[in-house]
């Protein structure tokens, strides 16, 4: 395990916000983490788990001990006629892992290509894109309890997946302990490894209009997994800025869901609103459209701005602070609520 002090975090968060960690521990194995918890001083200290840094907004220097997850490794752990189960260390880059599965001839994650972040963060956020979410391919994960050092395995039900949500995003109720089977593991668990079940035979997920357009443009009627992967990468690259060039955290707000009755009421006032019926009977509204309709595209608060090509993305125009990002986000939330009566929920965690 590598221990560092007064570590600049600009390179460790995709917004590129300037901040420091008082102490940063590079956790490269389960044994490294066990050693941290065996140290009485560090075991008792507050901790902040840092993966790929693609879903956080830093508003200042990080005082808790930063656990930088760098647990690597990829392998096939099971294979039969129905599915192949693959496992990756929590520190693996998500897109690189998706690419690796295709290189191994194991399709199923191609719709999730080019999503920033780490493998360990993918179930925390239940990342999803173009008709597929992590929960659709999830098998199980191993995590360590940061209070007790116990390692346990969670299945999909225990992870309590929801739309960009999981058990790892919620703290246990005050006075109660989070558990492997109960709700509330935020700040309590560190994910070590994640396993995904890739079903056989492979069937492409092409329900999204952008993918259907690519099929029409190319004349392909039966795409291969690699073609779907390439289309997804091209679509995302055209819509979203590269965080290596323009700091951002991808989609900043969740797409809100409303009842059909609420949707009809909004349509009566806003006939052009972009909306999608969901299998559970609710209606999902396009948060980017709501923000754009309120006139925010291209606007800024300090050096934090709304991306000109996609209003759902907030960007660092150069030297933005976390406070400016938060102020901009709150102003957008207020505008959308005042016009549509809808409360937008941010995706990134504010630290």
Give the predicted meaning of each segment.
Residues 336:
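Conserved ATP-binding N-box helix of the HATPase_c
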